[in-house]
Design a protein with these regions (language model features):
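Terminal peptide-recognition signature
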Residues: 57, 99, 137, 170, ...
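Gly/Ser/Thr-rich loop/hinge elements
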Residues: 177-235, 271-277, 281
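Ser/Thr/Pro/Gly-rich low-complexity linker/stalk segments immediately outside membranes or between
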Residues: 33-52
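N-terminal Sec-pathway targeting helices
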Residues: 4-32
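Solvent-exposed loop/turn segments at secondary-structure junctions
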Residues: 141-145, 174-180, 196-197, 203-207, ...
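Extended, small/polar residue-biased N-terminal targeting/export presequences
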Residues: 53, 67-132
């Protein structure tokens, strides 16, 4: 009996060793993933020195709309050379701000931690009013929390569910952008299900889709639940303030037979951007 048990003990020992190796490899792989991919999600581990930090952010900028060609190659090289001489992370951020203007163009910028919080604190909800049977909904810019986004979208959708509506005015004049997800979900009773708009990111096309009151593919995925569709005339109002996600919302109505657009030309920021939380507490909007 003891002789028969020895092979079993050896097998158990081998299994234990294999499991231990797998655990170590898994931990190492996980650490590598966090280190290599974490910065794209605001996870900076281990704490980077100024040079490593700057290099990683330049890598993120490579996805910028203008991060191709000789101009970006030169700007990137200049930034990298300056970063090598930097002694603090804040000094690196100043260098990165210059590079960001080239990689991302006019629709890119750095936000201080306080400025990012100000956007949340300055949340403005949509409003609505009825004049006879014509409903007007104001669709302001939005850059708040997920909870505020749900409230924003639901407020719009509920207003569009009013009884006896014979026409709708969608007021985008003060919409300076933000998160398109709650905007489009809230206006879903006016939009047909399917592809609402499309985004081209690094040569690949991504469709922003609407299905049963849920928006996906652009901005924060947001749902107001399945709502009845309003088949009424729609007037969309614009101004020179209408920008970014406000312009994307305007584009969602493009080509619909029952829609007319009135107002001044928009600001010309119809590109979309991505937020990257940085190690310094700032947010890079690219």
């Amino acid at each position: 009996l003891p002789r028969r048990a020895r092979p079993r003990r050896r097998v158990l020992k081998i299994v234990a060793i294999v499991l231990a190796v797998l655990v170590v490899l898994g931990a190492a792989a996980g650490a590598w993933l966090v280190h290599s991919m974490g910065p794209a999600f605001g996870i900076w581990w281990p704490a980077p020195n100024p040079q490593s930090y700057g290099s990683r952010v330049l890598d993120l900028m490579d996805s910028g709309i203008h991060a191709t060609g000789q101009e970006w190659a030169q700007a990137r090289a200049d930034a990298a050379a300056r970063i090598e001489k930097a002694t603090t992370h804040d000094e690196v951020d100043a260098i990165l701000t210059d590079a960001l203007a080239v990689a991302g163009g006019k629709h890119s910028f750095m936000l201080d931690a306080g400025e990012a919080q100000d956007l949340v604190d300055s949340y403005i909800a949509p409003t609505s009013s009825m004049d006879g049977c014509v409903l007007t909904v104001t669709v302001p810019g939005f850059a708040g929390t997920a909870e505020q986004g749900e409230e924003y979208a639901t407020t719009l959708a509920d207003a569009l569910g009013a009884e006896g509506v014979c026409g709708v005015v969608v007021d985008l004049r003060d919409n300076d952008g933000g998160d398109m997800g709650p905007m489009l979900a809230g206006l879903s009773p006016l939009l047909p299900d399917g592809t609402v708009t499309s985004l081209v990111i690094q040569g690949a096309t991504t469709d922003v889709t609407l299905k049963d009151g849920a928006i996906s593919g652009g901005g924060t995925p947001t749902s107001v639940g399945a709502r009845g569709k309003l088949d009424v005339p729609v007037a969309v109002l614009t101004s020179s303030t209408t920008a970014s996600s406000g312009e994307q919302t305007l584009l969602a109505f493009r080509g619909l037979d029952n829609v007319r657009v009135f107002g001044a030309p928009t600001r010309g920021y119809a590109s979309v951007n991505q937020e990257y939380p940085l190690y310094t507490g700032r947010t890079m909007v690219l």
